Amino acid sequence: MTDYFALKERPPYFPERVPCHILEHVPQGFYLAKHEQRWALCCTDKKPIHIDFTDTLYRRGGKEYLPKAFKNMNGKRIFDATAGWGRDSWLLACRGFQVTLCERQAYLYTLLAQAIELAKNTPETAATAAQLTLVYQDSCQYLRTTSTQFDAIYLDPMYPPRQKSAKVKKEMAILHILLDDEAGDTAENLLLLQTARARCARVVVKRPHTAPPLGNQVPRYCIDAPNTRFDVYLH
C-alpha cells in the first residue's frame, strides 16, 4: 500500500516523511479518522480499530510462552522486526525487556505511536511504555544501518489464522491487506530471517504448529504453545 488517507486532518502521529491525503468525505478502503477522541483505523465496511495498551486485556495474566524464548540472555534488548499490533512487544516490555518495535506500514505506525504515548501518560502503564522505542522503517534496512546493539531479534511472519478468536482473525485479515499479503515463507521474510541471524546471536521466530521452520532453517530448540511455537536460533 502506497497511498494513505486521513479524514479532515493529518494525524499528529503519522510519519513525517510520508504523504497523507487529507479528505473531507469518507473514502473507500482504509483511512485514519478520529473515533472516541482517538485516531483509529477505519474502513467503510469495518468497525474502527485502535491500539490501547492501557486496556486491562494487555495486562492480564495467564500462560506466557513467548518470554521463555528469551530466557538466559546476557541483556534485555529485543528488536521486534514485525511489530504489527504491538501485542508481543507489550508483553515483553511487561516482563522487563527493552523492546524496539519496527513498523513500515504508516497506518500501523500511527496507531502504535498513539498507543505508546497514551500508555506513557497513564500511571498504571507508564513504566512499561518507557521500555518501548518505536521506529518507522523497513526492518531489513534498519538492521543493516543501525549502530544499536540488540540481545535478540523477534520475527512473526503472518500466517492465516487458525483456531483463534473472531477479533484476532479480523485483525490478522487486516494485516494481510495492509501489508499486501506478504505472509508466510515469502522471499522477503526469508531475507529478514537471514539478515536477523547475521546481525544477532539470538533470533526467535513465531510459527504455526503445522508449519515447517521458516526457510527450512532448523532452530536450536523450540518453545511449544497450544496453537503456535517459537523457534529459537542461536550462534
Swiss-Prot record:
- UniProt keyword Cell wall biogenesis/degradation, yes or no: no
Keyword S-adenosyl-L-methionine on this protein? yes
Positions annotated to bind S-adenosyl-L-methionine = R87, D88, E103, R104, D156
Q: Which SUPFAM superfamilies match?
A: S-adenosyl-L-methionine-dependent methyltransferases
Under the heading InterPro entries, the entry gives: 16SrRNA_methylTrfase_J, SAM-dependent_MTases_sf
Q: What is its EC number?
A: 2.1.1.242
Please name the Pfam families in this protein's record. Answer: SAM_MT (PF04445)
Q: Name one GO cellular component term.
A: cytoplasm
The record's catalysed reaction(s) read: guanosine(1516) in 16S rRNA + S-adenosyl-L-methionine = N(2)-methylguanosine(1516) in 16S rRNA + S-adenosyl-L-homocysteine + H(+)
Function per UniProt: Specifically methylates the guanosine in position 1516 of 16S rRNA.
Q: Which family does the similarity line name?
A: Belongs to the methyltransferase superfamily. RsmJ family.
Q: What is this protein called?
A: Ribosomal RNA small subunit methyltransferase J
